[in-house]
Amino acid sequence: MQQYCISPQLNMISMKKVVLFLFFTSLFFSCKKEEVVPTDDNELITTVELIFTDANKKVSTFSFQDKDGDGKTPPEKFDKIVLDKNMSYSLEINVYDETKNPKANITEQIKLESDVHIFVFKIDPASLLSLKAIDKDKNGLPIGLLSSGSTQNVAGAGKLNLILKHQPPVNGKAVKTGNEAGGSSDIDLVFDLSVK
């Protein structure tokens, strides 16, 4: 049987290499990595349903639908909103992503993330229709999936600009204050509006 003998000098050099290797390895792996903050991306919304119910319980649904979701092709559907004059209304909004199969109900996601979403209604002329959100987030701020309002005793035509603002916190500070300022838009649609 052959025996190998390692000289003490060679053993010492090998030991130094091992110690240096372990030292640099521990430095490499002990460095803290910067924590990645998850992004709070905007929702892809291809379909919007506005469900108006008047004081007599008559239901009218008006829709926007753009199934490709990227705006490269014209929307498949963009209804004109037609309401009766001198009438009270409740409004329910449903939104979907139809690029997925089955379609994704984004309304539920907005409810879960209500503290970073708000629907804004801009009516021109303002005398045609008033709308006010009646649902609130955990901070008591409006969401707008459920709203109430009324038309005046005047017929006319105009526009209803529906905006869904996405207002996630910035640097840990809340952006949502109950108005349109801040954040970005998930939806910015201008419906033709007629009050008869």
What are the functions of these language-model segments?
Residues M1-F29:
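Sec-dependent bacterial lipoprotein signal peptides
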Residues S26-L50:
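Bacterial Sec-dependent N-terminal signal peptides
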Residues P38-T39, F78-K85, T151-Q152:
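Short, solvent-exposed beta-strand/turn "edge" segments of beta-rich domains on protein surfaces
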Residues K58-D84:
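N-terminal edge beta-strand
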Residues M87-L91:
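Short beta-strand segments enriched for Tyr within beta-sheet-rich domains
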Residues D97-N105, Q167-A174:
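Short acidic/polar inter-strand loop motif in beta-rich domains
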Residues K100-L128:
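Structured interaction patches on ligand/partner-binding surfaces of diverse proteins
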Residues I123-K196:
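Helix-rich interaction surfaces within compact, conserved domain-sized segments
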